[in-house]
Amino acid sequence: MQGPLHFPADDGIVGGMRSNQDVAAPKLMTVNDYFKTPETLKPMELAFGVLRVADAPAPRHQSAVAHLFLALEAHVRARQLGRMWLSPLDIVLDDRQALIVQPDLMFISNEREWIVRDRVRGAPDLVVEVLSPHPRIGRTEERVGWFGDYGVRECWLVHQDRREVAVLGFADRRLRERRLFKAREPVSSDVLPEFSMSLEDILDV
C-alpha cells in the first residue's frame, strides 16, 4: 500500500551540541581517529568529521531488530543471496569526507560482497532503521539522504510508535519510490522480492 511518508521532526540529539553561536565548534575527526576511539555498545557515527553518540537502545527496539534480523537472515541464507549484518557495525560511506554510519540492520548482496573488507567500505543494498522513542543519532531525513546519495538501493524505516514501516526505494542515487505498510499488511521489498513479513510479527503484537 502506498501512502504519505512522514518523518519525525527530530529523531535524536547530538549530545552537548546546540544551535548557539556561543557554543564552540566540535573538533573534527578523521576516519582513522574514529577507529581509534574506545569501543562502546552505544550507537555511534561520524558525520562529516563530527562524532555523534546516542543512548543505548531500549528493549523494544532490540526486540524489533531481533525479529527482523532472524526473518531476513533465514530468507537470505536459504536463497544464498548474500549476507545480513547486525549493528553495531561501522559502514564507511565516504572515507575522505569522514562519513560513517551504523544502521540497525543491513543486507549486502553477493554482487556487493567486495565492500566487506577490514571494514564495510561502501553502501549496502538494503538498510533497516528501527525508529524508537529513545534518542537516536541525527535526523531521519539526513540519514536517508546519505543512504540515497551513496548508493543504498532500499531503506526501511520501522516506526514503532506509529506502527508502520516505510520502504524507500532509490535508483541513480535518488529517491524513486515510497511505500507505507501498516497493521497486518505484509512488508515487501524490491531488493528481496520474495520476502514478506507482517508488521505485527516485526513488533511482536
Spans of features found by a protein language model:
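Gly/Pro/Ser/Thr-rich low-complexity, intrinsically disordered segments predominantly at protein N-termini
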Residues: 1-205
